């Protein structure tokens, strides 16, 4: 198969400097990004679904996606974004993460049904012809990143030459994780319920401009001084944070080794992605977390520290808004949430336990049991306003099998009965809303083996179509199980 190459600008710069003495690392001059010219074959699941509905436009769902497309969460996370990215990846040259870090947990399965729980590595990694990019908007915990790579390679997944990490991405240190726990302890009754992965403190370092970036690993002569500032800042803010010069020395030595191993992965991903767009390469953006956890648009302060909505694609990858096309919103057939924060449609007692057990609702990253409730149309419409979704992937429809009736939260009212016209930004208002429900009939049939939309029970189809009517966005993909093939194309 013939190959085209896209050289790293870092490689060109290294070559231009000649053999003059330098105290910092540069990328090898021969380093390049290689793409297969021919698109990999469509997965069997897609081919089978297409063959089954040959006369239906559904066969074009995957191939008709725009050059730059995105998969974003449209609730509070854990919707099943990784599975859809894994299914779509063979149709794309690049899969890119634009924000977040190891707080995101994406569970995917290979063709043999083996489970992979990814946190930072993009979900396209299981497909040999796909290049995976971790953009500048992400935060990189280097030991965790290497741990994921080691786990993948020990299971036969080749990562060498297939992952690029932005030189502009910020480094997340163990100290950020320590600070995360100390801050949660200080908040006491205002417990936010973070993943304790250090995400918030790392983004805080970024905003206060004392954070370190991946490119700083190429300047180890000044790395220690910059890290010293970070350690001292943490020690000045938290009494429980112990710091010494020996700790700093140990961490610097540790990162010298990390720098050597990480070097082949480092690239100017802004350049790589924009050059790829010019070359008509197809890019799939994989969002972490979800819109209702967005730092600006989520249920603040019970949110993440980045922008997992459409705007985060541009700021987290360095690509222009005009090049972004289809955005697929991934929405669970019910709702779940990890940690604290408002949850208007939450179910308690046996009803909540039933959804939690049937859906195996335990966090990929934390293992914590997720809070569960009915589908919230008000929140979903709000997410659509922010992101402009072209379609939905409705996941875990099979979990609702066996219910005699299914409720959908269609509107909010104040305690005095006044109906709200939009999703409230004020937390006090949101905590007091009364949810108005629409009741739909359930179905008793196990639908986990269904692969054609018309074969779903009538009540299941009614549920899907009612969601489309209420929100005004078509459902193109329906998940009926965890496996790669457990997907219906509508």
From Swiss-Prot:
Transmembrane segments: none annotated. The gene is PURA1. Homodimer. One of its GO terms (cellular component) is cytoplasm. Pfam families: Adenylsucc_synt. NCBIfam families: PRK01117.1 (NF002223), purA (TIGR00184). PROSITE patterns: ADENYLOSUCCIN_SYN_1, ADENYLOSUCCIN_SYN_2. It is an enzyme of class 6 (ligase). This is Adenylosuccinate synthetase 1, chloroplastic. Mg(2+) binds at residues 78, 105. CDD domains: AdSS (cd03108). SMART domains: Adenylsucc_synt (SM00788). The active site is at residues 78, 106. Its cofactor is Mg(2+). Its EC number is 6.3.4.4.
């Amino acid at each position: 198969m013939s190959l085209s190459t896209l050289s790293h600008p870092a490689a060109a710069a290294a070559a231009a400097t000649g053999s003059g003495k330098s105290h910092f690392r540069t990328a090898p001059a021969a380093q390049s990004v290689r793409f297969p010219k021919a698109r990999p074959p469509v997965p069997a699941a897609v081919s089978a679904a297409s063959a089954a509905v040959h006369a239906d436009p559904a066969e074009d769902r995957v191939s008709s996606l725009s050059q730059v497309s995105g998969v974003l969460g449209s609730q509070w996370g854990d919707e099943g974004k990784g599975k859809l990215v894994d299914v779509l990846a063979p149709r794309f040259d690049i899969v890119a993460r634009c924000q977040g870090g190891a707080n995101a947990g994406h569970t995917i399965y290979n063709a043999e049904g083996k489970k992979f729980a990814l946190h930072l590595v993009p979900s396209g990694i299981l497909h040999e012809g796909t290049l995976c990019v971790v953009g500048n908007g992400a935060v990189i915990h280097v030991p965790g990143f290497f741990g994921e790579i080691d786990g993948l390679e020990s299971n036969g997944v080749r990562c060498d030459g297939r992952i690029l990490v932005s030189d502009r991405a910020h480094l997340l240190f163990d100290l950020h994780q320590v600070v995360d726990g100390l801050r949660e302890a200080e908040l006491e009754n205002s417990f936010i319920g973070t993943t304790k992965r250090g995400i918030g403190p790392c983004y805080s370092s970024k905003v206060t401009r004392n954070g370190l970036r991946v490119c700083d690993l190429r300047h180890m002569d000044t790395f220690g001084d910059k890290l010293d500032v970070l350690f001292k800042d943490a020690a000045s803010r938290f009494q429980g944070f112990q710091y010494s010069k020996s700790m700093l020395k140990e961490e610097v030595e540790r990162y010298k080794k990390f720098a050597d191993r990480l070097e082949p992965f480092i690239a100017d991903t802004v350049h790589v992605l924009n050059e790829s767009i010019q070359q008509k390469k197809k890019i799939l953006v994989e969002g972490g977390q979800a819109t209702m956890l967005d730092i600006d648009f989520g249920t603040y302060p019970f949110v993440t520290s980045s922008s997992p909505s459409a705007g985060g694609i541009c700021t987290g990858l360095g690509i222009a808004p005009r090049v972004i096309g289809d955005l697929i919103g991934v929405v669970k057939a019910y709702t779940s949430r990890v940690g604290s924060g408002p949850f208007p449609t939450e179910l308690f007692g046996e009803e909540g336990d039933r959804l939690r057990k049937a859906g195996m609702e335990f966090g990929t990253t934390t293992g914590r049991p997720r809070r569960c409730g009915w589908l919230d149309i008000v929140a979903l419409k709000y997410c659509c306003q922010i992101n402009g979704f072209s379609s939905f992937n409705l996941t875990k429809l099979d979990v609702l099998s066996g219910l005699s009736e299914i409720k959908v939260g269609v509107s909010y009212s104040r305690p005095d009965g006044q109906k709200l016209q939009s999703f409230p930004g004020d937390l006090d208002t949101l905590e007091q809303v009364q949810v108005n429900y629409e009741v739909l009939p359930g179905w008793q049939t196990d639908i986990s083996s269904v692969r054609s939309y018309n074969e779903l029970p009538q009540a299941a189809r009614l549920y899907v179509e009612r969601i489309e009517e209420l929100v005004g966005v078509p459902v193109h993909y329906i998940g009926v199980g965890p496996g790669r093939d457990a997907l219906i194309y509508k």
